[in-house]
Amino acid sequence: DHKNSPEKFYDNIEHHYEFIGDKLIIGKFCAIAEGVKFIMNGANHRMDGITTYPFNIFGCGWEKVTPTIEQLPFKGDTVIGNDVWIGQNVTIMPGVIIGDGAIIAANSTVVKSVEPYSIYSGNPAKFIKKRFSDEKIEFLLKLEWWNWSGEEIFDNLEILTSEAGLEELMNKYSKRDAIN
């Protein structure tokens, strides 16, 4: 959702250093608003010393206290599922997994993983509610509409974007399963 161009998206990823080895993985059909920041593992400091300050950044001999990769906290890859909507000015911390179909409200800070098809808001982001019942969420996770062909998605646009569409799909697929 960048107002200028998607090429500027990389500007939203902070403290990503290849030598650390973490990845930002973003699923299909995500709406990521302007101002979203992905903080990667390179932002983490050692916390086991008296100070957390990274003196090695000074160079000129100060790098003698450069921590090894093993000494730095590593939270893992940051994963954004499919069909996720992330509101404006959200900050996502390292190692967070945001489940398929989730919504993150504007100005939130996500510090823990988010369940699929749920809404989170605040700093730190807290669970607000599920978008659908557990039965419907389970169905949607199995359906994986984002993996359909472009033609199949196009043919089902009205269903995918309507409130009644979920019931229609559940009925359609339950009948299909009963036949098979």
UniProtKB/Swiss-Prot annotation:
| Signal peptide start and end residues | none
Q: Which domain of life is it from?
A: Bacteria
Q: Which UniProt keywords apply?
A: Acyltransferase, Antibiotic resistance, Repeat, Transferase
Q: Which GO terms describe its biological process?
A: response to antibiotic
Q: Which Pfam families does this UniProt record tie to the protein?
A: Hexapep
Supply the CDD domains for this chain.
LbH_XAT
| Cysteines joined through disulfide linkages | none
Entry GO MF terms = acyltransferase activity
Q: Does the keyword Acyltransferase apply?
A: yes
Q: Looking at the keywords, is Acetylation present?
A: no
Query: What InterPro entries does UniProt report for this protein, alphabetically?
Result: Hexapep, Hexapep_transf_CS, Trans_hexapeptide_repeat, Trimer_LpxA-like_sf
What EC number(s) is this enzyme filed under? Answer: 2.3.1.-
The Swiss-Prot or TrEMBL record describes its family as follows: Belongs to the transferase hexapeptide repeat family.
Q: What is this protein called?
A: Probable macrolide acetyltransferase
**Species the sequence originates in:** Lysinibacillus sphaericus (Bacillus sphaericus)
List the taxonomic lineage: Bacteria, Bacillati, Bacillota, Bacilli, Bacillales
